[in-house]
Amino acid sequence: MLKLFSAFRKNKIWDFNGGIHPPEMKTQSNGTPLRQVPLAQRFVIPLKQHIGAEGELCVSVGDKVLRGQPLTRGRGKMLPVHAPTSGTVTAIAPHSTAHPSALAELSVIIDADGEDCWIPRDGWDDYRSRSREELIERIHQFGVAGLGGAGFPTGVKLQGGGDKIETLIINAAECEPYITADDRLMQDCAAQVVEGIRILAHILQPREILIGIEDNKPQAISMLRAVLADSHDISLRVIPTKYPSGGAKQLTYILTGKQVPHGGRSSDIGVLMQNVGTAYAVKRAVIDGEPITERVVTLTGEAIARPGNVWARLGTPVRHLLNDAGFCPSADQMVIMGGPLMGFTLPWLDVPVVKITNCLLAPSANELGEPQEEQNCIRCSACADACPADLLPQQLYWFSKGQQHDKATTHNIADCIECGACAWVCPSNIPLVQYFRQEKAEIAAIRQEEKRAAEAKARFEARQARLEREKAARLERHKSAAVQPAAKDKDAIAAALARVKEKQAQATQPIVIKAGERPDNSAIIAAREARKAQARAKQAELQQTNDAATVADPRKTAVEAAIARAKARKLEQQQANAEPEQQVDPRKAAVEAAIARAKARKLEQQQANAEPEQQVDPRKAAVEAAIARAKARKLEQQQANAEPEEQVDPRKAAVAAAIARVQAKKAAQQKVVNED
């Protein structure tokens, strides 16, 4: 009974809410085998073909490259891209890529040489002897990404799963109309796909491996069953055809009955999902040693004469693939990259094929029908009934149209998988997916701006905190320096105290002189001589300063000379008028007169040696000379009119008269010199 229940649960499948059943339109392209496309003359390889940042360039313009040669380096989540063929790098510049707005991204442009030479390939046939880390690194460096449409780096996804993965799901549903790339790959390369699944299982070591495939692919189902005939570790689950059963959350629920939590990932419930195309790329990377340089692309639509599935080199222009398939465009021809529900219209055909390109749809006017005008929402709730994510598309539409980002976020717009089921059933022909895509892009931009603002605020606060810490540390250092002297200051203070103590000790010690010896006073004498020399040097410096000040001002010098002469004459007059009983020693008088004359000559010499630019005013000099002559005449007259009882020594009078005449003569000469 338990075995029966276990077997029943093993094959049980669940059903999700919502979903639609549009026309499949798969028979146009799934009936012919995979074929190769002739090489294009020029390849455009965008550096970013996956979720995450672009890699670092490792080639330059003019370099020769081989097929499989890395064009960028992959570090962290950055996935490298590789040359799709051999040739020459002719440019590295922005180029329009696979995007609804054909945004330009940095790309490497290669001109093919037609030889299509590979780099040396090193396959790992013994991959089971390799460690988990080695296999993940090889998968990452060979550029393998999710080929089901998301483009998430496979190596990063495997690394993030860790040891908590219990169920490995291989997505082979391919539920969107027109697309048959995975269907044809399983028909033609079923053994290689299974080998890639085994490599993934060796890395993850899951408890069970499930392949989910819709029942509208009978040939692929039969091929997989034939390859898995002797395998008991891989289970093939055939599920009913329903759109969008190929969604990650929807297929997880169908096969396991587990729901991925809101805002979480499938790895949170022990599930990891990979696409069949990704499994095939893993096999070629690990066993064959070939980086991902091509993928299967469906070429379909009534505007294509030879629809089918082709091996398209990454970087091949869309125009080249369509022309090879017999593209017959109409006047208003539309080309869609992807399916009719989740794809987008290309603005022009020069965009390249990338890793997430699974279909190129060129429908005729009859296939699409007449375009319907968008009308107002009638709140019929048909979109809510069809939504596989259990959302309220009509409410999200109003929030998106009214720029109510908070309410849109509250109503879980991030859980929208953009499957297009709501727009398919809308009777008002409202392009709901376009509104939701735009709203999610605006919310992402707002969050990115908020993140940048928060980071800038954190940097500012960290800087302010650092400055405050430095200021506090600086104040603390200043306080410590004020309270405690530095080490060198302590040493200097200690040395000074030691010297003082030594001198005090020497002063208190008595001087003992032995008999017959003389005391040694050489140190005292040397100190005394040093003090005398220092005093003389200081006095000489002071004298030089005074002399310089005297020479610097010629008028001051002249005034001092006049004062000296007046003092000399006053002294002579006092001597002449002295009473007879107060006779002055003639030798002393002669000495004083000689000193006065010497001072006068010194002052005149300093005045004569003054700087040329410091000349005395000639008029002032003439006035001084006239005053000196007048004073000399007055002195002579006073001497002549002196009373008889006050006889003056005739020699002194003669000396004074001679001095006066000499001074008058010098003043006159100085006047003549100044006038010249």
Swiss-Prot record:
Subunit structure: The complex is composed of six subunits: RsxA, RsxB, RsxC, RsxD, RsxE and RsxG.
Cofactor(s) essential for the protein: [4Fe-4S] cluster
Full protein name: Ion-translocating oxidoreductase complex subunit C
Recorded name of the encoding gene: rsxC
Bilayer disposition of the protein: Peripheral membrane protein
Record's GO cellular component terms: plasma membrane
PANTHER family xrefs: ION-TRANSLOCATING OXIDOREDUCTASE COMPLEX SUBUNIT C (PTHR43034:SF2)
Cofactor descriptive note: Binds 2 [4Fe-4S] clusters per subunit.
Disordered as annotated region, ranges: 600-652
InterPro entries: 4Fe4S_Fe-S-bd, 4Fe4S_Fe_S_CS, Ion_transpt_RnfC/RsxC, Nuo51_FMN-bd, Nuo51_FMN-bd_sf, RnfC_N, Soluble_ligand-bd
Low complexity biased stretches: 605-615
GO MF term list: 4 iron, 4 sulfur cluster binding; electron transfer activity; metal ion binding
HAMAP family for this protein: RsxC_RnfC (MF_00461)
Binding site for [4Fe-4S] cluster 1: C377, C380, C383, C426
Domain spans labelled 4Fe-4S ferredoxin-type: 369-397, 407-436
Keyword Nucleotide-binding appears in the UniProt entry: no
Gene3D superfamilies: 3.30.70.20, NADH-ubiquinone oxidoreductase 51kDa subunit (3.40.50.11540)
Described function: Part of a membrane-bound complex that couples electron transfer with translocation of ions across the membrane. Required to maintain the reduced state of SoxR.
Binding positions ([4Fe-4S] cluster 2): C387, C416, C419, C422
E.C. number(s) listed in UniProt: 7.-.-.-
Predominant subcellular localization, coarse grouping: membrane
Keywords on record: 4Fe-4S, Cell inner membrane, Cell membrane, Electron transport, Iron, Iron-sulfur, Membrane, Metal-binding, Repeat, Translocase, Transport
Similarity comment text for this entry: Belongs to the 4Fe4S bacterial-type ferredoxin family. RnfC subfamily.
One GO term of the biological process aspect: electron transport chain
